[in-house]
């Protein structure tokens, strides 16, 4: 059965975790690799005495539509090609598949491809999954024709897709959870457990309302560290 974070699940000290002192590889989009994300990864490293290596690339998703030079299967291939073995492989879902309108079934299929690549290339390793984060301001935004018209034409389609498709984000997260349950992968539902909502989102997001700021990463870092420790 899929392992899902429950608050308070990790009551022991970090030193007692079987994941203490391990090597962790992280794959994903900009959530996993922008400068501010170093806050949460440094926290994992501190609490778990872990060495954390980021393979994530901005704009990446599970589907090749997000870019063959960026997508997660390619990140995993590059990681495995280094010959370095990691103890824990974290798949951190972005919102790029959502905004690009990737079919849910395609997201599911490519998550399974990522899992299979890791299981084949590093059979002794653990795989953990972090869901996409909520982006409440964009999820609740209404498409404004006047705002759209005021934009340079080259930006309009992406903007329209972002606003329309982002309302489907909960469906993508539900499918991420379903796949992890099927594959017996521990799943951290950041969408529901991060505590980020439409009221506090301005405190936790940068000006684009899509990427967390330093306060946002400070807000989720302990939830993530406890999840890693417990699984």
Where are these regions (language model features)?
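Bacterial N-terminal signal peptides
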Residues: 1-6
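Boundary at the C-terminal end of the N-terminal hydrophobic targeting segment
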Residues: 11-15
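Conserved SGNH/GDSL esterase-like catalytic core that processes O-acyl groups on lipids
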Residues: 17-26, 31-112
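Residue-level recognition of beta-strand->loop/alpha-helix junctions
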Residues: 54-56, 131, 189-192
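Alpha/beta-hydrolase-fold catalytic nucleophile elbow
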Residues: 92, 130-131
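Alpha-helical scaffolding segments of alpha/beta enzyme cores, especially the outer helices
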Residues: 106-109, 113-120, 171-178
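A short helix->loop->beta-strand "cap" motif at the edges of active sites that frequently abuts
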Residues: 121-127
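Catalytic His-Asp segment of secreted/periplasmic serine-dependent ester chemistry enzymes
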Residues: 135-231
């Amino acid at each position: 059965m899929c392992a899902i974070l429950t608050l308070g699940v990790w009551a022991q000290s970090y030193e007692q975790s079987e994941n203490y002192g391990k090597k962790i590889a992280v794959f994903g989009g900009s959530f996993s690799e922008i400068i501010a994300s170093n806050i949460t990864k440094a926290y994992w490293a501190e609490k778990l005495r872990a060495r954390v290596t980021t393979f994530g690339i901005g704009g990446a998703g599970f589907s090749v539509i997000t870019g063959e030079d960026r997508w997660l299967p390619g990140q995993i291939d590059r990681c495995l090609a280094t010959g370095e073995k990691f103890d824990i492989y974290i798949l951190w879902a972005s919102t790029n598949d959502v905004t690009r309108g990737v079919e849910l079934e395609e997201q599911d299929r490519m998550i399974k491809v990522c899992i299979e690549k890791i299981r084949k290339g590093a059979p002794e390793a653990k795989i953990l999954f972090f869901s996409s984060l909520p982006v409440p301001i964009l999820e609740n935004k209404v498409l404004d024709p006047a705002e759209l018209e005021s934009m340079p034409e080259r930006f309009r389609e992406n903007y329209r897709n972002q606003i329309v498709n982002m309302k489907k984000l909960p469906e993508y997260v539900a499918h991420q959870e379903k796949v992890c349950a099927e594959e017996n992968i521990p799943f951290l539902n950041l969408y529901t457990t991060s505590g980020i909502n439409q009221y506090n989102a301005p405190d936790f997001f940068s000006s684009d309302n899509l990427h967390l700021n330093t306060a946002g990463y400070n807000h989720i870092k302990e939830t993530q560290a406890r999840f890693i420790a417990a699984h």
